[in-house]
Structure formats: structure tokens, C-alpha cells
Swiss-Prot record:
Bilayer topology annotation: Peripheral membrane protein
Keywords, ordered alphabetically: ATP synthesis, ATP-binding, Cell inner membrane, Cell membrane, CF(1), Hydrogen ion transport, Ion transport, Membrane, Nucleotide-binding, Translocase, Transport
Residue positions binding ATP: 151-158
Protein family: Belongs to the ATPase alpha/beta chains family.
Catalytic activity: ATP + H2O + 4 H(+)(in) = ADP + phosphate + 5 H(+)(out)
Protein name: ATP synthase subunit beta
SMART domains recorded: AAA (SM00382)
GO molecular function annotation: ATP binding; ATP hydrolysis activity; proton-transporting ATP synthase activity, rotational mechanism
Subunit structure: F-type ATPases have 2 components, CF(1) - the catalytic core - and CF(0) - the membrane proton channel. CF(1) has five subunits: alpha(3), beta(3), gamma(1), delta(1), epsilon(1). CF(0) has four main subunits: a(1), b(1), b'(1) and c(9-12).
Length: 462
């Protein structure tokens, strides 16, 4: 084993001297045993010359002193992968943090892996059914695609993520991996307990590097989650769902260590390697001929500026965007997805078929017309509208309410049984509303129901 000594410590960045001819390679993991017996992992980032390397620590460097012995593991950070990690909570280096003993797996993967080769990629584009009406109809997710989930605090990002995990686990017997990147520890704790209660924990692996962790952990934890997902795709030929919350923090962590590593800052003070780092992560999230990794990434937009380099770089990789809107959440319509702001690359008649495409466009059209009329309604009231416009408003309000649906993971709050709605049922329901087949039903009949038949049944009880 190659042994070195700490020569300098600046925050999360540690310089280590090695004997001549024993320099670790870039990205090799080094370990330090602290005086109290705990282990600390460093990742090699730069060769500074004169047998010295600069590394980034994966945990706090408190208590380290110059001269401490450092061991080179001679390979990148390895994390446990396999069915044993399901139902467990790990940190960036793969150690369990759920207090339920160690994780014993027969295999480990490096967190730095190359993206699949071109000839291994699956080229067919197919829709990934989520069972959530508003998503399946208006911004369908693609299998192996990447979706950005935009939303402020308290509009339901976490509940939507949990419902997706639940639907994939129950309806499609799929596995999910959740990577909490620079998240609030409280939210991670809530997610863990809610998953235990809703019973989806056995189909999910959780990896956390939270806000209180040093930037090294936050910049690498997304890769840890991705490696676990890649195992299920490549070795078990499964379709896996990967949730990253929040992808902005991945970039933010990179920018925090960038200056300490001596790199010149780029636009807005971000690291010059921003596009490369994002590309290396996103290029691994793909479908191969064996299986797929479909990702949903929550994206924080600093100061609501979509041109900020961090969200702008993430945009380039996305296939679909789901925008959660506070104004819709205030109406009590959940999931609070904005049907006019959300987009999908695969909402194309050649991919989803004419029926789906035409219905989606008709829904958007009627909602847009309603939005245009809202100013007139606010000033003059409904009575001043033409009969044609009154009909548009009435149907649009029914469509708006029919876009809501009771969630399995929110049963405790709504008191309603969760609903998984198949795509053909979704299309049929919206087609009937727009065609005027249900003009005689009250709009409250469409609120928080699954299929159109349920709305008709509900109307009878009102």
C-alpha cells in the first residue's frame, strides 16, 4: 500500500505528499484514519508537482493535522451495489447512515464510470407511463429520458417524487434510486419516514449528501446514486427511476471547491468545467439495449433567473420539463403542475400517436383561452361573456379540475384512495369533457377523481 503524509489543509481541500514514484492517479480514493479511529475519504483532484497531490475531502476535515498518514486505495471511490442496497440509506462513500448495520453486497462499483458506448444505446423512443394524468397527457416522460422538475418551496415537489416512486414500484415493479444532493436534512428525514409508512422503501435505495456536508460529498453523491442505478440497468436488465434532488446543488458544490483547487472562475463565478461535469453526469443517464435509467431532476433556479449558467446548462440535457406552480397549488389543485408551462420533446404525433397529441393540444388550447379570458372575468364578471366563451370557461374549469388526482402517498391528508390512471383512460376522459359530453355535470364532480367514470359517479352523489 502506498502511504503519504498530509502537508496542507485548506477547508475541504487537503494536500498530500507521497514518496517518489508512488503518486496516486487522478480520482483515486485516499483514506485517512483519524486519531479517534474514524475513517475519512479523500479524492485525488490534481498533481501539483514535487510528489504532491491536491485532494477534496468527502467529509469534514475537522481534527486533521499535518503529518497524518494517508493510504492510497489505488482505485476510485467504490460503493456497494445490488439488491442489498434497496431499503437502505447510504452516504457518498456507500456507508449506511440509517443505523441498521452494515450493507453486505457481493459487488461494488466505482462512482466514476464511462457512459455506455454508442452501439449499446437504445434508439427507440417510447413513453413512460406514470399513472398521473397531467404528466401522461401533457408532458409525457420518455423511457430513459431526463425530466426537470421546477418548483419553489411547498408546491409539492417531494410529494410528486414520492408518488412517482410509489407508482413505479407498485404498477411496474420497478426500482428507484433517490439521490439527495445538498438537500435540507429535515426533508430527507421526512422522505425516509414517509417511505417507510407508504411501504415503497423496499423498492428504493436512498443516497444522501445533505446541505451540512462539505462540498466534496455534495459534488459526488449524485454519481453514487447513478452507479447504484446503473447496476440495476446493466446487470439486472431493469428499468430504473433515478431521482436527483437537487441538481443545482451538484453544480454549486463544484463551484465551491473550484477556486480552492486553483481554477480560474468562469461566468457568474462558476467553475470553468461546469458544462463538462454536467455532461459527464447526464451522459450516463441513458437507455441501453439491456434496460433504462429514467431520471427526474429537481432544479432550483437561483433568483428565478433561467439564464443563470447552472440551470441553463441543465436545460440542454432535458427531454421534458414539469413546472409546479404556486398559483395552481393555491387553488387546491394537486399535483400543482402548470399545464401551459410544462413541455415534453416526445409530445409528437409520430411518437405518442395522433389521438394523444390532438387531445393534449385541445386541452392546452382551451386552458389558454380560459387564461386569456380571466382578465375580462375579473373586471366585468362572467355575465359579460358571449355564450361561446361561457361554454369555453365552463369546460376549461372542468378540465382544470380533472387534471387533479388523489395520490397514494397523500391518502393520509386527503382521506381519498390514491388513483393510478392508465393513459387510454386519461385521453378518453379529456376528449369527452372537451367534446361537451359532460356539460351537464357540476365542476366539483371532476375534482380529485381518477377516471371520467368516477366523475360521473361522483356527480350522482352531489
Amino acid at each position: 500500500m502506498q502511504e503519504g503524509k498530509i502537508s496542507q489543509i485548506i477547508g475541504p481541500v487537503v494536500d498530500v505528499d507521497f514518496p517518489e514514484g508512488q503518486l496516486p492517479s487522478i480520482l483515486d480514493a485516499l483514506t485517512i484514519t483519524r486519531p479517534d479511529g474514524t475513517k475519512l475519504v479523500l479524492e485525488t483532484q490534481q498533481h501539483l508537482g514535487e510528489e504532491r497531490v491536491r485532494t477534496v475531502a468527502m467529509e469534514s476535515t475537522d481534527g486533521l493535522i499535518r503529518g497524518l498518514s494517508v493510504t492510497n486505495t489505488e482505485r476510485p471511490i467504490q460503493v456497494p451495489v445490488g439488491p442489498e442496497v434497496l431499503g437502505r440509506m447510504l452516504n457518498v462513500v456507500g456507508d449506511p447512515i440509517d443505523g441498521r448495520g452494515s450493507v453486505h453486497t457481493s459487488k461494488t462499483y466505482s462512482i466514476h464510470r464511462s457512459a455506455p458506448k454508442f452501439d449499446e444505446l437504445s434508439t427507440k423512443t417510447e413513453m413512460f407511463e406514470t399513472g398521473i394524468k397531467v404528466i401522461d397527457l401533457l408532458e409525457p416522460y420518455s423511457r430513459g429520458g431526463k425530466t426537470g422538475l421546477f418548483g419553489g418551496a411547498g408546491v409539492g415537489k417531494t410529494v410528486l417524487i414520492m408518488e412517482l416512486i410509489n407508482n413505479i414500484a407498485k404498477q411496474q415493479s420497478g426500482y428507484s434510486v433517490f439521490a439527495g444532493v445538498g438537500e435540507r436534512t429535515r426533508e430527507g428525514n421526512d422522505l425516509w419516514h414517509e417511505m417507510m409508512e407508504s411501504g415503497v422503501i423496499d423498492k428504493t435505495a436512498l443516497v444522501f449528501g445533505q446541505m451540512n456536508e462539505p462540498p466534496g460529498a455534495r459534488a459526488r453523491v449524485a454519481l453514487t446514486g447513478l452507479s447504484i442505478a446503473e447496476y440495476f440497468r446493466d446487470e439486472e436488465n431493469r428499468d430504473v427511476l433515478l431521482f436527483i434532488d437537487n441538481i443545482f446543488r451538484f453544480t454549486q458544490a463544484g463551484s465551491e471547491v473550484s477556486a480552492l483547487l486553483g481554477r480560474m472562475p468562469s461566468a457568474v463565478g462558476y467553475q470553468p468545467t461546469l458544462a463538462t461535469e454536467m455532461g459527464e453526469l447526464q451522459d450516463r443517464i441513458v437507455s441501453t439495449k439491456k434496460g433504462s435509467v429514467t431520471s427526474v431532476q429537481a432544479i432550483y433556479v437561483p433568483a428565478d433567473d433561467l439564464t443563470d449558467p447552472a440551470p441553463a446548462t441543465a436545460f440542454a440535457h432535458l427531454d421534458a420539463t414539469t413546472v409546479l406552480s404556486r398559483s395552481i397549488a393555491e387553488l387546491g389543485i394537486y399535483p400543482a403542475v402548470d399545464p401551459l408551462d410544462s413541455t415534453s420533446r416526445i409530445l409528437d404525433p409520430n411518437i405518442v400517436g395522433d389521438d394523444h397529441y390532438d387531445t393534449a393540444q385541445a386541452v392546452k388550447q382551451i386552458l389558454q383561452r380560459y387564461k386569456d379570458l380571466q382578465d375580462i372575468i375579473a373586471i366585468l364578471g362572467m355575465d359579460e361573456l358571449s355564450d361561446e366563451d361561457k361554454l369555453v370557461v365552463s369546460r376549461a374549469r372542468k378540465v382544470q379540475r380533472f387534471l387533479s388526482q388523489p395520490f397514494f402517498v397523500a391518502e393520509a391528508f386527503t382521506g381519498l384512495a390514491g388513483k393510478y390512471v392508465k393513459l387510454d383512460e386519461t385521453i378518453k376522459g379529456f376528449k369527452e369533457i372537451i367534446a361537451g359530453k359532460h356539460d351537464n355535470l357540476p365542476e366539483s364532480a371532476f375534482y380529485l377523481v381518477g377516471t371520467i367514470e368516477e366523475a360521473v359517479q361522483k356527480a350522482k352523489t352531489l
